[in-house]
Each structure stands twice: as C-alpha cells, then as structure tokens.
C-alpha cells in the first residue's frame, strides 16, 4: 500500500473501518484507527519507543472525514439490530452472500424488521449492480442518502448500504 496515493489509502481506511463496524460480532477498533493512526511504516512496533507508538491526536483534525464516517457507521450499527447478531445460528439464518464479478462483496441481512444489503468494493475498479426492484440507499462512502436505487454504480474502495426497515420480502424471493 505504500506505493498507493494518500487518497487511495484514505479510501481504503474508510472502507476497512466500515467492514469492521458492519461485520457481525463485536467490532474492535484499534486505538487511533478512526484517525488513520500511523506507526511511520514500521511493521512491528511492539518494542519501539513511545515516540513511535504514541497517539498523535493532531491527526484527528487532519483525518476528520474518517472520524465522521466512524461515527456514522456506529450510528447505523446501533439503528439496525440485524448488524448485531450474537448467535452463530442467527447469522446463518439471516445473512446470505453474493459476489459481483468475483471481486466485490455483497451480503444481505434480512429478518422480520429489516432487509439490508451491504456492498464492499476493495478493488480499484468500477462495477455496477442492478436490483430486481429499487432499494432505499442509506449510505454511500460516508454520505447519508435516503433515495431509492435500482441500479447502483460501485466506485473503487467503496461501501454502500441499503435498508428497508420494517419490511420483509416474501420467502423465495431472489437475492
């Protein structure tokens, strides 16, 4: 990743933060991750000085966008119980996966109150996906939206969240 531009590294950091906060289970955010903590390119800083391992709180202002996205994703996680299943059986029953071009991860979480689709594009490529019917878009790379989308353009290093609260599609409906 060192050869990537700073912009690409920031996009990846935002997407990876989303992956942590939108995964089932208890999310673990390493100290300073929300403001792109750096250890100056050193691979293992366990025995390094406090100068290397300290939290540089000035980065919070520099990376405010990641801080804000972290807050938004925590809010979304709190608002949607389907993102907080505790039991393996619940995950197996309510979560299904699909892929787009074998590069983009898309998963659906559905119960009697929520019908949610989450898309992660970890590549530098653009993709598109068309749903059978329009879905309410609630989050696109840090922007909170509230519009219906049938066809979505999936930007590089992006996170996209769709949700229909209090809605259940009939059993047997295709993903």
For each feature predicted by the language model, list its residue ranges.
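Short, acidic/polar
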Residues: 12-17
């Amino acid at each position: 990743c060192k050869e990537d531009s700073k912009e690409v590294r920031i996009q990846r950091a935002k997407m990876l933060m989303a992956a942590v906060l939108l995964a089932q289970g208890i999310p673990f955010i390493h100290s300073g991750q929300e403001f792109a903590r750096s250890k100056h390119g050193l691979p293992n800083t366990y025995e390094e000085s406090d100068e290397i391992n300290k939290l540089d709180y000035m980065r919070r202002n520099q990376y405010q966008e990641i801080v804000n996205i972290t807050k938004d994703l925590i809010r979304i996680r709190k608002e949607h119980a389907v993102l907080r299943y505790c039991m393996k059986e619940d995950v197996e029953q309510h979560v299904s996966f699909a892929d787009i071009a074998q590069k983009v991860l898309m998963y659906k979480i559905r119960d009697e109150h929520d019908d949610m689709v989450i898309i992660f594009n970890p590549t530098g490529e653009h993709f598109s996906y068309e749903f059978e019917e329009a879905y309410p878009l609630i989050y696109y790379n840090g922007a909170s939206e509230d519009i219906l989308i049938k066809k979505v353009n999936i930007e590089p290093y992006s996170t996209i969240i769709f949700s229909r609260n209090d809605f259940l599609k009939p059993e047997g409906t295709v993903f």
